[in-house]
Amino acid sequence: MDAIKKKMQAMKVDKDGALERALVCEQEARDANTRAEKAEEEARQLQKKIQTVENELDQTQEALTLVTGKLEEKNKALQNAESEVAALNRRIQLLEEDLERSEERLGSATAKLSEASQAADESERARKILENRALADEERMDALENQLKEARFLAEEADKKYDEVARKLAMVEADLERAEERAEQGENKIVELEEELRVVGNNLKSLEVSEEKANQREEEYKNQIKTLNTRLKEAEARAEFAERSVQKLQKEVDRLEDDLIVEKERYCMIGDSLDEAFVDLIKGLEPFWNPRNPKPPTPKLPTPTPEELAAMEEARAAAEAAAAAEAEAAEAAAAAGEAGPDGAPAAPGEEKAPAKEPTPPKEPTPPPPPPPPFEYSIDLPPEGAEVPYVKNYEPPPPGSEPEPVPAAEGEAAPAAEGAAPPAEGAAPPAEGAVPPADGAAPPAEGAAPAAEGAAPPADGAAPPAEAAAAPADAAAPAAEAAPAEAPAAEATAAEAPPAEAAPAEAAPAAAEGEAPPA
């Protein structure tokens, strides 16, 4: 009922506010009308001035346009005010409908209240009926007492009659005996009546005791109701306090959970920084890849075109021709070495030291991609961990050792592994022979390394000319499509001993043939 009254009061307040706003809007509309009338009067005055003053025609026209614009604005404002008034009227109607609904609810609530009062009246009537029954029982007890008195009086009268009859029938023994028997029967009846009277008295006493007990129970029940009401109020107060404490604890738990998430994120960032520090401090340690810092994908080499394949075949044929020419030169040098001790020494400059194969350049490591988004299930350490999680060092797999650093300029590169030794009887290099690959340029630092699965260069392949510098950009190994042809090149090149330098023109051709496809 209080909520309904509050709602009705709030609705009345809204209604009064709406009516006040409607009155304010009407007053604004009236003000706008008065202003419009004033503007019309000003326009008339301006027209008179225009007629009288022709020189100020332009100024008055501009003022007229301004006044007409203001008039239109006022008309628009008036229309808006009318629309607002209509909206407020609709709102008032809705509020009246809500008021009617609330009145209906109030009527239903009053009906329920009347039903409850009727039920209370019925219970009160039942209590009065029980009291009336108790009074009727008391009246019955009084009537029984009166009947008992009458029975005693009748018994006394019977005794008197018995005495009279005994005196009259004293002479007749049979009558006397009968009278005695009757007297005995009367005495028995008197005893029975006395016993009944005692039973009735006991019942009356028990009823009085039960009535007293009932009164005591009623008082006890009232006291229990009062105590239960007080306990109920205390329990409600405790429940409200418990709800408030639970809300406070829930807020504290939410705050602690947020702090825990922030600390876990900071812990993961510290772990990543520690991993990066370990990678920077320990040389040869592979970086720690994780979902935040994934491993970059291996770049794929493009598939060579038919034109590039044809160029590679031509370069391979030119390399084989150069190897055959070097083999012939080696045979000629061997023959000249055999003839040298007999009195025909080899001319200086005929033989040269075998050129050493240049090392392939390294491929630059691409920069790592940006880390992925943070994931608690992956990035956080296992539960119960007391120390930071650091990945143990794993040695690199066999075959992935770093390549040796190429020799500096002016120094000879080490001989290729598996290179064919000089033929027996070959003359040592002459004193005036040019050192091998003195002017050869070292491989560029940014050159790409050999692709996975690509065939390595032939161990015994013929070196390029001593005077020709190997181009750094074309010094990459062959593509992935040439693994089948590598054994044949190794077999042919292993048979050829080191010989004199091939013509300078063969070196660029061989280098172009070994270059990977663009």
Swiss-Prot record:
One of its GO terms (biological process) is pole plasm oskar mRNA localization. Both isoforms are only expressed in indirect flight muscles. The keyword Coiled coil applies. SUPFAM superfamilies: Tropomyosin. Keywords: Actin-binding, Coiled coil, Cytoplasm, Cytoskeleton, Muscle protein. It is found in: Cytoplasm, Cytoskeleton. One of its GO terms (molecular function) is actin binding. Residues 14-267 form a coiled coil. InterPro entries: Tropomyosin. Homodimer. The molecule is in a coiled coil structure that is formed by 2 polypeptide chains. The sequence exhibits a prominent seven-residues periodicity. This is Tropomyosin-1, isoforms 33/34. The gene is Tm1.
